[in-house]
Amino acid sequence: MNRDTICVQGGYTPGNGEPRQIPIIQSTTFKYATSEDMGKLFDLEADGYFYSRLQNPTCDMVAKKICELEGGTAAMLTSSGQAANFFALFNLCEAGDHIVASSTIYGGTFNLISVTMKKMGITATFVDPLCSEEELDAAFQPNTKVVFGETIANPALTVLDIEKFAKAAHAHGVPLIVDNTFPTPVNCRPFEWGADIVTHSTTKYMDGHGAVLGGAIMDSGKFDWMAHADKFPGLCTPDESYHGITYAERFGKEGAFITKATAQLMRDFGSMQSPMNAYMLNLGLESLHVRMQRHCANGMAVAKFLEAHPKVAYVNYCGLESSPYHALAEKYLPNGSCGVVSFGLAGGREAASTFMKELKLAAIETHVADARTCCLNPASSTHRQMNDEQLAAAGVPAELVRMSCGLESSEDLIADIAQALDKI
């Protein structure tokens, strides 16, 4: 089925006389006739629902739609994109393990990996996304369990060479996780290029209106966990908390990863998306394919205007022919990338501050990727926790402005940008 149709009708097919829109199952619990029936659910011997902290029918319908969009075999929703990335990584790693990650990832995820997970005994090596195959290979250690990157990094807007990173990961017997938030599956499907797990902050383009927080995790169903059983004991050895179930044996490579993440991590951490948020997310998904076209068109128009302006020192947008990532964008993102543009002003950080203050249509917000245009200075906000060396490695200099182009008229956006630049 075409992705446009999946956006509108995927995940839920109503029967005769049933609601045309997905129902909101706003219930914490579910009734069963016997304790034996419920016991089968707790033993993972039957499908169904017993507590919405782990699973909920509304959430599962939306997860199924996103899974269909990405071309995966299993999926789950989480309360936020940050929760999705944590679950995806922690589902594979434990104390003593190691992660290889792109250095230009979102600041919150960088902090998650470099600080919070370090406290859990999990270390990481960060690599330049444009590193050579030899440099990438050198980052691996005997205890490396996963490779992580973003299709389009936030806010440096670097493009991940998914095939290169997948090849390296698989050569070392570990999966590649790709955060596909910015392009969405409308513009890129990382599974088609070798990724094994895909994550999303559904708060961004999927919701599209700055209304609901959420995240999602999808499994390609292609990574053979049992072939690397020594690396992934959590998937390939009995789980004492579920009467000795071995996930990779019981659910196969198509379902083991998501089942474990749901049964263990969602059970213990409780980062479940609410049914109401899932319902509103689905409303956003129904127009995702249409909105992404406008976001990309506006992003390109703004990027071209900025590139030609004398007060702009540089522009990061992979759609521009001048971008060092343009060839990768043509390969992985032939239909467009996203509506986010980042750029540096010739006057430095002070000029960036003045520019943002003078904007009329674009609001200064920490958010990104919704219907309304917004901007921020990442070095003083989303990446504030990084030191100067880390900021440089992440591609986030002090003067950088990140602008998320919304659905307004591109002419109005450019006029607003022009008048703000005139005030510098």
Enumerate the language-model features and the residues they cover.
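PLP-dependent enzyme catalytic core of the Aspartate aminotransferase-like
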Residues: 1, 114, 123-124, 138, ...
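N-terminal "arm"/small-domain region of PLP-dependent enzymes with the aminotransferase-like
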Residues: 1-56, 64
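Conserved PLP-enzyme active-site core in the AAT-like
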Residues: 7-13, 75-308
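Short Gly/Pro-enriched turn/cap motifs at secondary-structure boundaries
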Residues: 14-16, 206, 270, 331-333, ...
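Short loop segments at secondary-structure junctions
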Residues: 29, 220-223, 345-348
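Conserved N-terminal alpha-helix of the aminotransferase class I/II PLP-enzyme fold
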Residues: 34-86, 108-116
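Short amphipathic alpha-helical segments
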Residues: 47, 73, 277, 281, ...
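Conserved C-terminal alpha-helix-loop-beta "cap" of PLP-dependent enzymes
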Residues: 292, 300, 304-307, 311-401, ...
